[in-house]
Protein backbone atom coordinates (compact mmCIF):
# COMPACT_ATOMS: atom_id res chain seq x y z
CA UNK A 1 0.00 0.00 0.00
CA UNK A 2 1.33 3.41 -0.95
CA UNK A 3 0.53 5.80 1.87
CA UNK A 4 2.98 8.49 0.70
CA UNK A 5 0.31 11.08 -0.19
CA UNK A 6 -1.49 10.48 3.10
CA UNK A 7 1.79 10.68 5.04
CA UNK A 8 2.78 13.91 3.29
CA UNK A 9 -0.65 15.40 4.04
CA UNK A 10 -0.33 14.34 7.70
CA UNK A 11 3.03 16.14 7.91
CA UNK A 12 1.50 19.26 6.36
CA UNK A 13 -1.25 19.13 8.98
CA UNK A 14 1.37 18.83 11.71
CA UNK A 15 3.25 21.85 10.35
CA UNK A 16 0.02 23.88 10.44
CA UNK A 17 -0.68 22.82 14.03
CA UNK A 18 2.91 23.65 14.97
CA UNK A 19 2.63 27.11 13.43
CA UNK A 20 -0.68 27.68 15.22
CA UNK A 21 0.88 26.74 18.55
CA UNK A 22 3.81 29.10 17.94
CA UNK A 23 1.43 31.94 17.05
CA UNK A 24 -0.66 31.33 20.18
CA UNK A 25 2.44 31.28 22.37
CA UNK A 26 3.79 34.43 20.73
CA UNK A 27 0.46 36.17 21.33
CA UNK A 28 0.41 34.85 24.92
CA UNK A 29 -2.88 33.06 24.37
CA UNK A 30 -2.00 30.38 26.91
CA UNK A 31 -5.45 28.82 27.32
CA UNK A 32 -5.83 28.41 23.57
CA UNK A 33 -2.30 27.00 23.33
CA UNK A 34 -3.08 24.35 25.92
CA UNK A 35 -6.37 23.56 24.18
CA UNK A 36 -4.57 23.04 20.85
CA UNK A 37 -1.98 20.71 22.34
CA UNK A 38 -4.13 17.57 22.09
CA UNK A 39 -4.68 18.05 18.35
CA UNK A 40 -0.90 18.40 17.95
CA UNK A 41 -0.23 15.22 19.95
CA UNK A 42 -2.85 13.34 17.92
CA UNK A 43 -1.23 14.49 14.68
CA UNK A 44 2.17 13.26 15.88
CA UNK A 45 0.63 9.91 16.82
CA UNK A 46 -1.00 9.60 13.40
CA UNK A 47 2.36 10.18 11.70
CA UNK A 48 3.97 7.60 13.96
CA UNK A 49 1.24 5.11 13.05
CA UNK A 50 1.57 5.77 9.32
CA UNK A 51 5.34 5.43 9.51
CA UNK A 52 5.03 2.13 11.39
CA UNK A 53 2.82 0.69 8.66
CA UNK A 54 5.21 1.49 5.81
CA UNK A 55 8.57 3.19 6.19
CA UNK A 56 8.83 6.27 3.96
CA UNK A 57 11.10 6.00 0.94
CA UNK A 58 14.36 7.91 0.81
CA UNK A 59 12.75 10.38 -1.60
CA UNK A 60 9.83 10.90 0.76
CA UNK A 61 12.21 11.39 3.68
CA UNK A 62 14.00 14.11 1.71
CA UNK A 63 10.66 15.81 1.04
CA UNK A 64 9.66 15.62 4.70
CA UNK A 65 12.99 16.82 6.13
CA UNK A 66 12.28 20.58 5.73
CA UNK A 67 8.93 20.12 7.45
CA UNK A 68 10.57 18.29 10.33
CA UNK A 69 13.13 21.08 10.74
CA UNK A 70 10.36 23.69 10.78
CA UNK A 71 8.36 21.72 13.34
CA UNK A 72 11.41 21.28 15.58
CA UNK A 73 12.26 25.00 15.31
CA UNK A 74 8.68 25.94 16.19
CA UNK A 75 8.68 23.54 19.12
CA UNK A 76 11.91 25.03 20.42
CA UNK A 77 10.49 28.56 20.20
CA UNK A 78 7.27 27.50 21.94
CA UNK A 79 9.30 25.90 24.74
CA UNK A 80 11.31 29.12 25.17
CA UNK A 81 8.12 31.19 25.37
CA UNK A 82 6.60 28.73 27.84
CA UNK A 83 9.72 28.93 30.01
CA UNK A 84 9.47 32.72 30.07
CA UNK A 85 5.80 32.42 31.07
CA UNK A 86 6.62 29.88 33.78
CA UNK A 87 9.28 32.23 35.17
CA UNK A 88 6.72 35.07 35.23
CA UNK A 89 4.21 32.87 37.04
CA UNK A 90 6.83 31.71 39.53
CA UNK A 91 7.66 35.34 40.27
CA UNK A 92 3.97 36.14 40.81
CA UNK A 93 3.54 33.14 43.09
CA UNK A 94 6.60 34.25 45.05
CA UNK A 95 5.19 37.75 45.43
CA UNK A 96 1.86 36.32 46.51
CA UNK A 97 3.58 34.17 49.14
CA UNK A 98 5.42 37.21 50.51
CA UNK A 99 2.17 39.19 50.66
CA UNK A 100 0.46 36.33 52.45
CA UNK A 101 3.32 36.12 54.97
CA UNK A 102 3.16 39.86 55.61
CA UNK A 103 -0.60 39.76 56.06
CA UNK A 104 -0.28 36.78 58.35
CA UNK A 105 2.42 38.44 60.45
CA UNK A 106 0.87 41.88 60.69
CA UNK A 107 -2.79 41.14 60.07
CA UNK A 108 -3.51 39.77 63.56
CA UNK A 109 -3.23 43.09 65.36
CA UNK A 110 -6.77 42.87 66.75
CA UNK A 111 -8.09 45.61 64.52
CA UNK A 112 -5.67 48.16 65.96
CA UNK A 113 -3.65 50.33 63.69
CA UNK A 114 -0.12 50.56 64.94
CA UNK A 115 1.37 53.97 64.34
CA UNK A 116 4.16 55.91 66.04
CA UNK A 117 3.04 58.39 68.66
CA UNK A 118 4.29 61.93 68.91
CA UNK A 119 3.88 62.13 72.70
CA UNK A 120 6.01 59.39 74.15
CA UNK A 121 6.69 61.26 77.46
UniProtKB/Swiss-Prot annotation:
Gene3D superfamilies: Flagellar protein flit. Residues 1-50 are annotated as: Required for homodimerization. Pfam families: FliT. Keywords: Bacterial flagellum biogenesis, Chaperone, Cytoplasm, Repressor, Transcription, Transcription regulation. It is found in: Cytoplasm, Cytosol. GO terms for cellular component: cytosol. Residues 60-98 are annotated as: FliD binding. It comes from the Bacteria. InterPro entries: FliT. Its main location: cytoplasm. GO terms for biological process: bacterial-type flagellum organization; negative regulation of bacterial-type flagellum assembly; protein folding. Homodimer. Interacts with FliD and FlhC. Dual-function protein that regulates the transcription of class 2 flagellar operons and that also acts as an export chaperone for the filament-capping protein FliD. As a transcriptional regulator, acts as an anti-FlhDC factor; it directly binds FlhC, thus inhibiting the binding of the FlhC/FlhD complex to class 2 promoters, resulting in decreased expression of class 2 flagellar operons. As a chaperone, effects FliD transition to the membrane by preventing its premature polymerization, and by directing it to the export apparatus. Belongs to the FliT family. This is Flagellar protein FliT. It comes from Escherichia coli O1:K1 / APEC.
Amino acid sequence: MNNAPHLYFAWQQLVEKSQLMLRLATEEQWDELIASEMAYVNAVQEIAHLTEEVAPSTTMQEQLRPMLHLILDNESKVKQLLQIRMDELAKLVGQSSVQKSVLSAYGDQGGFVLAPQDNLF
